[in-house]
Design a protein with these regions (language model features):
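C-terminal cap/substrate-recognition subdomain and adjoining C-terminal extension
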Residues: 17, 22-23, 29-179
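N-terminal helical cap/lid subdomain that shapes the substrate entry/recognition surface
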Residues: 1-13
Length: 179
């Protein structure tokens, strides 16, 4: 998955930072809000209302998830190198995926004096298993089949959040447009 992201993010090579910043809100609306789950947003707000510290650890680039900043106390996301006002297409550090995500969580907990055994983590993929295993209250949300099976076997909470009804669905063209 890390190699996939590295290759995918190379497509940003030469992209002007200012233009990408302007486009990031549109990207957010198209890729994030189109998959938005109101229950997930409510859940984060409930955690904050209870005084819980909220952290989003994601493999999505920082400028893509920046509009979520008001919802979370902190966001850990990969960044791209910048040279002369343009993105290089190279990440500044390894994206937080798999064990790297769990290590980022442990590091964050250490730096902020947090007890992971009293913490909750939400995830949908088996690649997030190390992070889920690091906390006292793991939750599989809209999990892939393998994670759902494992979570149930381990007695973890499994939740299925529903997307916004009427969300725009991106479709691929079936052929070239007719003139």
């Amino acid at each position: 998955r890390t190699d996939f992201l590295r290759n995918f993010y190379r497509k940003y090579e030469g992209a002007p930072v200012l233009q990408v910043d302007e486009d990031s809100l549109e990207m957010f609306n198209e890729f994030i809000l189109a998959k938005s789950f109101p229950a997930a947003i409510r859940r984060v707000r409930e955690h904050r209302a209870l005084g819980h510290r909220t952290l989003l650890i994601t493999g999505a680039l920082d400028f893509v998830v920046q509009p979520l900043k008001p919802l979370f106390d902190e966001i850990l996301a990969p960044s791209l190198e910048i040279n002369g006002g343009k993105y290089s297409g190279r990440m500044t550090h390894v994206p937080p995926i798999g064990e790297t995500r769990a290590a980022a969580l442990r590091s964050y907990a250490d730096e902020n004096n947090l007890d992971l055994k009293e913490s909750i983590a939400y995830a949908d993929s088996t690649s997030d298993l190390p992070m889920l295993e690091a906390v006292g209250f793991p939750v599989a949300v809209n999990p892939e089949t393998k994670l759902a099976t494992l979570a149930r076997r381990r007695g973890w909470l499994v939740e299925n959040f529903q997307p916004i009804s009427g969300s725009p669905k991106k479709t691929l063209p079936l052929g070239s447009k007719k003139e």
